[in-house]
Amino acid sequence: MERIAVLAYSGGLDTSCCLKLLEDKYGYKVVSVCVDVGQPEEEIKEVEEKAKKLGVLKHYTIDAKEEFVKDYIFRAIKANAMYEGYPLSTALARPLIAHKVVEIAEEVGAEAVAHGCTGKGNDQFRFETTIRIKAPHLKIIAPIRDLNLTRAEEIEYAKEKGIPIPTESKKYSIDENLWGRSIEGSELENPDFVPPEEIYAWTKNPVEDKEEEIVEIEFKEGVPVAINGEKLEPVELIKKANEIAGKHGVGRIDIIEDRIIGLKSRENYECPGAVLLLTAHKALEQLVLTRDELRFKEIVDSLYGELIYKGLWFDPLREDLDAFIDKTQERVTGTVKVKLFGGTARVVGRDSPYALYSKELVSFDEKEIDQKELAGMVKYHGLQAMLYEMRKKRK
């Protein structure tokens, strides 16, 4: 009986070497899986062709774009999910990819699943945690990490096995899905190196933006449903948000990020649609939620982002947090106007049938609130600080 390993396959050097290593070093027949979460269409086709040329038993291409948006991105929006200023585009997709790989592994009766992650990055945690949660009986193999291979050793092995290598090695490592694009490697590893314009593909150079644009985002119970009055299907809405914000240079992110294992890394991202939608969503929450709800939700949102980053999407705590978040989102319905210009996204208007803002109460020209009645409240505001100061003076 054939021993089968299912490989999460991207078509890059790491996973292509994994494919052959699984055959040579581990004795497996390989089934490859590419999960489409918004990569370029031509890349998806190239991956399939390459897998077949390298002799896989079978290759699966799974279109998971709609599931990614509805079950992952929309939940991240409702949670204002960020990690150290980054909208979690790469991290958010990994549990879904790993879950799909597990489903194929169970379908084909595989003994093992494999990935091409190295030992220094975050993805090893994200893939393996999901796999162990969903299918603890499956063996996990990470050839690049487990064999401690360097990039040079991988290239040498690829030449030996006839794995196609571009004549010019890719300068940067790029990961792309509907929620964003990450660029790393080469000179970008120097935190003082100024990124060249060539690394960007989704966003226009902000200094070249000559005309501002006001875009209106409509939300229903925390989920974006329309842009500029046009109702859009989930995948199309995210694509549209990326397109509109990207042409104004919105969503360029350059940060020093704390990885799971403790390393600090320099990361560059393009997340135009994410920045636009998260900015609008947060503004609408400020209009409809109470002060105490907002304060507590900030804590929940921060924890939610950390769970995503650490690969704990399927942890029960995430479901618990969703229960609270979903309750708050019942009133997050309305529209937000965002001005886009020169790399910035600035909220300039918001409206909701659930708004807690009252023009009559807040206006200096109205008498809905009897100002005299506030004197007593003001008198005892900061009472503990006053008592503390009195005690100090007695000493």
UniProtKB/Swiss-Prot annotation:
Keyword Transmembrane: no
Molecular function terms from GO: argininosuccinate synthase activity; ATP binding
Organism, as annotated: Methanocaldococcus jannaschii (strain ATCC 43067 / DSM 2661 / JAL-1 / JCM 10045 / NBRC 100440)
Quaternary assembly: Homotetramer.
Record-listed E.C. numbers: 6.3.4.5
Name this protein carries in UniProt: Argininosuccinate synthase
Positions of ATP binding: 8-16, 116
UniProt similarity note: Belongs to the argininosuccinate synthase family. Type 1 subfamily.
Residues the entry annotates as binding L-citrulline: 86, 122, 126, 173, 182, 257, 269
Gene Ontology cellular component terms for the protein in this record: cytoplasm
